[in-house]
Amino acid sequence: MIAIIDYGSGNLASVEKALHGVVTSDPYKIDMADKIVFPGAGSFSAAVSGIKNIRDIIIEKIRNGTPYLGICLGLEILFSESEEGPGTGLSFFNERLKRFKKGIHMGWNTVEFNDNIIFSGIKKGEYFYFVHRYYAPLGSYTCGKTFFNGYFTSFININNIYAVQFHPEKSGEPGLKLLRNFGELA
């Protein structure tokens, strides 16, 4: 079962439809999940607040090897903190998310990614849909980057953690392929 984290915001319906997952904030269902998806929309602080009762089980599941896919805010919540506001994320990466100096990154853009199972069958140069104002700087966790006012991290994969800054559920066939690839992980 794929648990799609319900933190009181986010684009849950299209992710649920694409992955045939279960939208939940129930710690028991999350604990029983084979995979976890944290879809993204909303603010860092609101997400931190929205997961306060399930934060520990999410961290435990990820640490124990459960495949995790973070989408947009689901990538951002992996970090310690954000310029967006107060609160402590899941802290898998001890970095502070930054705010773009010039507006919001909204629209279609490419991802320069290393070969990875999650991008299997997706051509380099494909476009994905982005909408975000905050970003993860480049770091040792960066497996894919995108250019908007400079390069930022748009794809992370370390062990069982997969995270994308774009919205695959809004990115047409390449995005749906990425979601299928995640769903097919052993």
Curated annotation (Swiss-Prot):
SUPFAM superfamilies, per the entry: Class I glutamine amidotransferase-like
Domain of life: Archaea
Cellular component terms per the entry's GO annotation: cytoplasm
Catalytic activity: 5-[(5-phospho-1-deoxy-D-ribulos-1-ylimino)methylamino]-1-(5-phospho-beta-D-ribosyl)imidazole-4-carboxamide + L-glutamine = D-erythro-1-(imidazol-4-yl)glycerol 3-phosphate + 5-amino-1-(5-phospho-beta-D-ribosyl)imidazole-4-carboxamide + L-glutamate + H(+); L-glutamine + H2O = L-glutamate + NH4(+)
Entry EC number(s): 4.3.2.10, 3.5.1.2
GO BP annotations, alphabetical order: L-histidine biosynthetic process
Entries under InterPro entries matching the protein: Class_I_gatase-like, GATASE, Imidazole-glycPsynth_HisH
Protein's pathway: Amino-acid biosynthesis; L-histidine biosynthesis; L-histidine from 5-phospho-alpha-D-ribose 1-diphosphate: step 5/9
Subcellular location: Cytoplasm
Transmembrane segments: none
Active site per database record: C72, H167, E169
Subunit (UniProt): Heterodimer of HisH and HisF.
Family matches, as HAMAP family: HisH
Function: IGPS catalyzes the conversion of PRFAR and glutamine to IGP, AICAR and glutamate. The HisH subunit catalyzes the hydrolysis of glutamine to glutamate and ammonia as part of the synthesis of IGP and AICAR. The resulting ammonia molecule is channeled to the active site of HisF.
Protein's UniProt name: Imidazole glycerol phosphate synthase subunit HisH
Originating species: Picrophilus torridus (strain ATCC 700027 / DSM 9790 / JCM 10055 / NBRC 100828 / KAW 2/3)
Name of the gene this protein is made from: hisH
